[in-house]
């Protein structure tokens, strides 16, 4: 595993680490430290099941259930955000095409969450 800053930014990219495999404590500590240092980590080209996604999320820290979430996967810790529709025209996830401004989820908690883990399945080529 390698962790490198993305050129000209505060973002760090974690390379050569298949997240679908168990992560050793040494790599887990390095990932947590990198997150504390920069606040944004990128893991490219991962193909994860929901169980694998949750297992990796637990490497970073215990997940917080988001009470207002209306688009849950089969796991209560995983919420689906999407602007896609199924063949019947029903939304596949929350938010749709609603405009959003920058915000932090659950920052109003007495002890705010540490961060948010986003897993992109279909992404635009830019933007």
Q: Predicted regions span which residues?
A:
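Fe(II)/2-oxoglutarate oxygenase catalytic core
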Residues: 2-127
């Amino acid at each position: 595993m390698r962790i490198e800053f993305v050129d000209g930014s505060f973002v760090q990219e974690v390379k050569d680490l298949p997240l679908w495999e168990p992560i050793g404590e040494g790599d887990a500590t390095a990932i947590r430290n990198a997150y504390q240092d920069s606040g944004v980590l990128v893991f490219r080209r991962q193909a994860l099941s929901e169980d694998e996604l949750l297992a990796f999320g637990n490497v970073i820290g215990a997940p917080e259930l988001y009470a207002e979430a209306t688009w849950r996967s089969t796991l209560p810790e995983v919420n689906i955000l999407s602007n896609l529709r199924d063949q019947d025209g029903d939304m596949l996830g929350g938010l749709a095409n609603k405009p959003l401004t920058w915000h932090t989820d659950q920052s109003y908690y007495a002890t705010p969450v540490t961060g948010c883990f986003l897993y992109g399945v279909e992404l635009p080529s830019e933007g």
